[in-house]
């Protein structure tokens, strides 16, 4: 009886994501990275390399796996009419720390060509807001990305 009562107040153990859910999360992140790449209407090789690095950092995706997820994310981003679907998946499956890391990667993509376009700035701030990343955390991530 005491054990059951105690279990009510303990945090549940994090459950590993099944393969298909993990893939949806990866594609959602890739779609947001693709949108960051094209926010200034110029998609460069540096931005692509940073998007691949983001997937490697966040999910351990390298090589052909990373390219496939980025391509699937690009296709998904082309069909998006709002950011609701990818943002909902990311909010559900990423902790705050992981969402801050994602925002830092989005800032890196935005700064890939050495300058920040106003459209890129607006995009990353908007996504940070939708992901419930506090503004202070987003700005600290921005400073780390710029350094």
Residue ranges of model-derived segments:
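Small-residue-enriched hydrophobic alpha-helices in membranes
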Residues: 1-147
């Amino acid at each position: 009886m005491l054990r059951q009562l105690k279990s009510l107040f303990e945090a549940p153990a994090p459950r590993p994501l099944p393969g298909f859910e993990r893939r949806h999360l990866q594609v959602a992140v890739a779609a947001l990275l693709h949108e960051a790449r094209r926010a200034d209407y110029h998609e460069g090789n540096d931005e692509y390399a940073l998007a691949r690095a983001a997937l490697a950092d966040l999910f351990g995706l390298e090589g052909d796996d990373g390219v496939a997820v980025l391509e699937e994310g690009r296709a998904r981003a082309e069909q998006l009419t709002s950011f609701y679907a990818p943002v909902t998946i990311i909010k559900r499956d990423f902790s705050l720390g992981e969402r801050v890391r994602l925002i830092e990667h989005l800032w890196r993509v935005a700064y890939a060509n050495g300058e920040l376009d106003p459209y890129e700035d607006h995009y990353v701030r908007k996504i940070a807001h939708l992901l419930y990343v506090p503004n202070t955390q987003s700005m600290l991530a921005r400073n780390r990305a710029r350094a």
